[in-house]
Design a protein with these regions (language model features):
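Active-site neighborhood of divalent metal-dependent phosphoester/pyrophosphate hydrolases
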Residues: 123-144, 149-278
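Residues that act as N-cap/strand-start positions at coil-to-secondary-structure junctions
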Residues: 29-30, 41, 83-85, 110, ...
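N-terminal secretory signal peptides and thylakoid transit peptides that target proteins
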Residues: 1-14
Length: 279
């Protein structure tokens, strides 16, 4: 694709919605941008486009500078309701151990700019890692994410799981959530695909979380609460088949939402999404 054509999607605001999107469906980026799963020469970039009601192309760029005068790779992805209007792209052909900037555009509306980094190679004098886990929105403390975002010594964020929690209005943390005005969305325990999507959306809408995701690439693995508490192959401590259906269905729904909403690569050919390890 010619760079001139791609840049049309990154026009300055305000913009007039084209016929591709209805006038009352102007795209927004309410959940920010994120990057993750880097290797030595590529990284996943992510966003979600709100305000769409049908399939729509989304342009993206990766550059050496935040003014995007030195674009090194670009492309177009198509998003739709079947992926909850999330967008993921693997930016390839990058240099190892280098910072990059990225952004998206849909129907002339540009996303916030994110900053990411590829994994280094060879011997290192230092490497800055932030460790995060067990991030229950109900309890607050997401200001730790803001601190990570502003720490220039941190290169990558290693998130060891429990990125979201599944509980509802009467579950763990509910009283604290009410006192902090951080009640769960949706209010019920999450079971359906729409439930899991809404819970991920709540976490990604948090301003501290958005700052971290826009500033640092994540290395991710899930734990148990991305689906529900203490699962095993045949069920989970916090799953009641009589009321919540088959465990395997809930597990697969949770994994689908996770892949939609997180900056993580799709499994290699022949691998399954439920396998969180790689060869």
């Amino acid at each position: 694709m010619r760079r001139r054509r791609l840049l049309k999607g990154f026009a300055s605001l305000p913009v007039v919605a084209s016929t591709a999107v209805a006038a009352n469906d102007i795209p927004t980026y309410a959940h920010g941008v994120a990057s993750g799963d880097p290797d030595n020469n590529s990284v996943v970039i992510w966003t979600r486009v709100s305000g769409l009601r049908k399939s729509q192309p989304v342009s993206w760029q990766v550059a050496l500078d935040d003014n995007f005068e030195q674009v090194v790779c670009s492309g177009v992805e198509v998003t739709n309701q079947y992926q909850d209007y999330t967008v993921k792209a693997v930016a390839k052909g990058l240099d190892s151990g280098r910072d990059y900037f990225y952004r998206f555009a849909c129907d002339g509306v540009s996303s916030p700019v994110g900053k990411t980094r590829t994994l280094p190679t060879g011997q290192l004098e230092k490497l800055g890692l932030a460790l995060a886990s067990c991030s229950n929105h109900a309890f607050g403390y997401f200001n730790a994410y803001d601190a990570i975002a502003h720490d220039e010594a941190i290169d990558f964020v290693l998130h060891l799981g429990d990125y979201i929690y599944e509980y509802g209005a009467t579950g763990w943390g509910a009283e604290t959530a009410l006192s902090l005005n951080r009640a769960h969305t949706p209010i019920n325990e999450i079971v359906s695909l729409q439930d899991y999507r809404e819970r991920h959306a709540q976490y990604k809408a948090d301003s501290d979380s958005q700052r971290m995701h826009a500033a640092k690439p994540l290395l991710l693995v899930w734990d148990d609460h991305e689906s529900t508490n203490n699962p095993w192959v045949g069920g989970a401590q916090n799953h009641q088949p009589a009321d919540e259906g088959r465990w395997i269905d809930r597990r697969d729904i949770a994994i689908r939402a996770y892949y939609e909403w997180m900056p993580i690569r799709e499994p290699n050919v022949g691998a399954e999404r439920k396998n969180f390890w790689r060869r």
